[in-house]
Curated annotation (Swiss-Prot):
Keywords from the UniProt entry: Chloroplast, Plastid, Transferase
Family annotation (InterPro entries): Rhodanese-like_dom, Rhodanese-like_dom_sf, Thiosulfate_ST/Rhodanese-like
SUPFAM superfamilies: Rhodanese/Cell cycle control phosphatase
Listed GO MF terms: thiosulfate-cyanide sulfurtransferase activity
Superkingdom of source: Eukaryota
Protein name in UniProt: Thiosulfate sulfurtransferase 16, chloroplastic
Domain Rhodanese: 20-120
Annotated catalysed reactions: thiosulfate + hydrogen cyanide = thiocyanate + sulfite + 2 H(+)
Organism (species): Arabidopsis thaliana
Family matches, as SMART domains: RHOD (SM00450)
Binding site for substrate: R85
Function of the protein: Thought to act during the early stages of leaf senescence. Catalyzes the transfer of a sulfur ion from a donor to cyanide or to other thiol compounds. Substrate preference is thiosulfate > 3-mercaptopyruvate.
């Protein structure tokens, strides 16, 4: 049973927006460059991957950085650009003991496409 709780739960962008309005917090795991081009209102940016000279690599300080913004029992919705990084980030957070995390299907691309509130 405990193993099942480590399987990420995913929600649509419309459900994610409703959760945000209900008090959940938005963790945007895109790069700072992507985040600066537009993000969901109120989102906190902690990159899951860093862009370096040799391409993208996992942020070794991701869990520590997330922990500086969120508690392990906080309700968090996790998004990236299209869903690939956020599902991995959500899985890592669950394995690290975060209990209220949900992945956003389609990420920021789907969020913006659905006309949900954004900020540049």
């Amino acid at each position: 049973m405990a193993e099942e709780s480590r399987v990420p739960s995913s929600v649509s962008v419309t459900v994610a927006h409703d959760l945000l309005l209900a008090g959940h917090r938005y963790l945007d795991v895109r790069t700072p460059e992507e985040f600066s081009q537009g993000h969901a209102c109120g989102a906190i940016n902690v990159p899951y991957m860093n862009r370096g000279a040799s391409g993208m690599s996992k942020n070794p300080d991701f869990l520590e950085q997330v922990s500086s913004h969120f508690g392990q029992s906080d309700n968090i919705i996790v998004g990236c650009q299209s869903g690939g990084r956020s599902i991995k980030a959500t899985t890592d957070l669950l394995h690290a003991g975060f209990t209220g995390v949900k992945d956003i299907v389609g990420g920021y691309s789907a969020w913006a496409k659905n006309g949900l509130p954004t900020k540049a």
